[in-house]
């Protein structure tokens, strides 16, 4: 049975949902000109702070402000507790999976996942076979994309385990809302998020190599041209650690050092924000100018921790995603608390035949795609676009998965004509160290174009503050 989109704030007859009622009443009492003035103030402040991201291939300029909407997404405490429990379960299983495939490969031997889908995956790193990492933790930082379907059920849409981004916008959105509307934070008990950098740093320090009492942590960036450079600089500053580029580091005697004006300083943990391919030109891409020659040697020797671990990307590949519920059963002996979105694997002939016959109804994604690129949304696509994807699927079916076109939940959002429903998702950030921790809420992304289901900032999406109510 098809469902219309679930409205996060309002019931079908227009009354506010219980957890939104106080906010909905406040919103209805606000003069339109005050809200317009606050929206303009938010834009001006974000411009001043420089909260931008780079857009590649855009002639009009590379820097763009991520639009911020002043209507928050609100989650009641009981919903958040269930989400939090399910997210922790999922990330524990994903870490167990990554450890397993680089060691005993029990899940492959049991036939739960076809071995070739893992071992022939471009994100599988044979160099990591047999490498033990502190605590058996590979995905120290995970951004899990959650959607709510028309029936009101939460589903995991995507696991982001390589270099998940967006947490700086979560933190800045909260600061902005507290500045613009302090009265709302007096009227609601909203779980704080500003301790995220402290929790992240504590987790990174907790996974330092064995025997290091006072670890030195750095954040490795590709540089100012990177699309998420604002976030790199922001997090380094918030954690009080050095922001470094590959040229700032070197390896000597299987240890990693940072060049400083006082001489070389030993480094224990690297929070890397660059992909595996660029980390070590002696092992991966030889033309990389972003990494550190010899880094993998130091890593394999156990003298440096890299977060997230090299080779983690195999677990966030979209061709592996359909198997995560089975990972939870296999490694934890539990049923998944948060389900997956139904997914067709186009490498399977029956799935491929079905999808090719129903392309105008489905969403098709490249298994290595990200940022909303390399995707077909059938109901919104033209005939030529659908035909182009059809030919691409026939030529290389293993490169694609397909999913139903979900009626993503909506939240009132300011549009040109006033408040209107817009589709949203949620990216909570899951931190793994001594324990698995989630700062309440996450980054709510919103598709600003009417009817659009694409929330990615690179595709014109915006963001909202996410409130988790404590009572």
Pin down the residues of each PLM region.
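Preference for protein termini
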Residues: 1-471
């Amino acid at each position: 049975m098809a469902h219309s989109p679930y409205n996060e704030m309002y019931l079908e007859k227009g009354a506010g949902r219980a957890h939104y009622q106080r906010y909905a009443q406040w919103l209805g009492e606000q003069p339109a000109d005050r809200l317009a003035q606050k929206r303009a103030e938010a834009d001006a402040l974000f411009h001043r702070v420089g909260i931008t991201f780079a857009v590649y291939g855009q002639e009009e300029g590379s820097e763009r402000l991520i639009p911020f909407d002043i209507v928050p997404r609100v989650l009641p405490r009981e919903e958040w507790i269930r989400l939090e429990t399910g997210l922790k379960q999922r990330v524990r299983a994903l870490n167990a999976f990554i450890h397993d495939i680089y060691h005993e490969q029990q899940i492959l031997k049991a036939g739960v996942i076809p071995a070739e889908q893992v071992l022939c995956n471009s994100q599988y790193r044979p160099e990591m076979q047999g490498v033990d990492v502190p605590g058996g933790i590979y995905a120290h930082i995970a951004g899990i994309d959650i959607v709510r379907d028309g029936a009101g059920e939460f589903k995991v849409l995507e696991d982001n385990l390589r270099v998940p981004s967006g947490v700086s916008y979560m933190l800045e959105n909260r600061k902005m809302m507290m500045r613009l509307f302090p009265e709302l934070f007096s009227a609601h008990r909203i779980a704080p998020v500003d301790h995220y950098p402290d929790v992240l740093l504590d987790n990174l320090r907790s996974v330092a190599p064995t025997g290091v009492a006072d670890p030195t942590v750095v954040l490795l960036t590709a540089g100012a041209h990177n699309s998420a450079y604002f976030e790199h600089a922001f997090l380094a500053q918030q954690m009080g650690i050095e922001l470094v580029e590959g040229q700032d580091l070197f390896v000597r005697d299987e240890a990693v050092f940072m060049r400083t004006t006082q001489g070389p300083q030993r480094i224990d943990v690297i929070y890397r924000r660059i992909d595996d391919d660029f980390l070590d030109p002696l092992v991966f891409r030889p033309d990389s100018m972003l990494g550190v020659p010899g880094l993998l040697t130091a890593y394999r020797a156990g003298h440096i921790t890299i977060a997230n671990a090299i080779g983690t990307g195999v677990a966030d590949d979209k061709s592996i995603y359909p198997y995560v519920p089975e990972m939870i059963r296999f490694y934890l002996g539990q049923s998944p608390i948060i389900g997956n979105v139904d997914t067709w694997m186009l490498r399977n002939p029956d799935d491929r035949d079905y999808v090719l016959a129903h392309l105008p109804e489905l969403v098709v994604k490249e298994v290595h795609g990200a940022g909303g690129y390399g995707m077909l949304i059938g109901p919104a696509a033209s005939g030529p676009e659908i035909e182009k994807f059809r030919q691409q699927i026939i030529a290389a079916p293993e490169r694609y998965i397909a999913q139903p076109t979900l009626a993503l939940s909506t939240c009132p959002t300011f549009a040109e004509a006033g408040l209107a429903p817009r589709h949203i998702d949620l990216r909570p950030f899951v931190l793994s160290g001594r324990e698995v921790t989630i700062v309440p809420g996450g980054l709510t992304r919103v598709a600003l174009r009417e009817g659009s289901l694409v929330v990615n900032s690179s595709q014109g999406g915006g963001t909202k503050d996410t409130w988790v109510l404590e009572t």
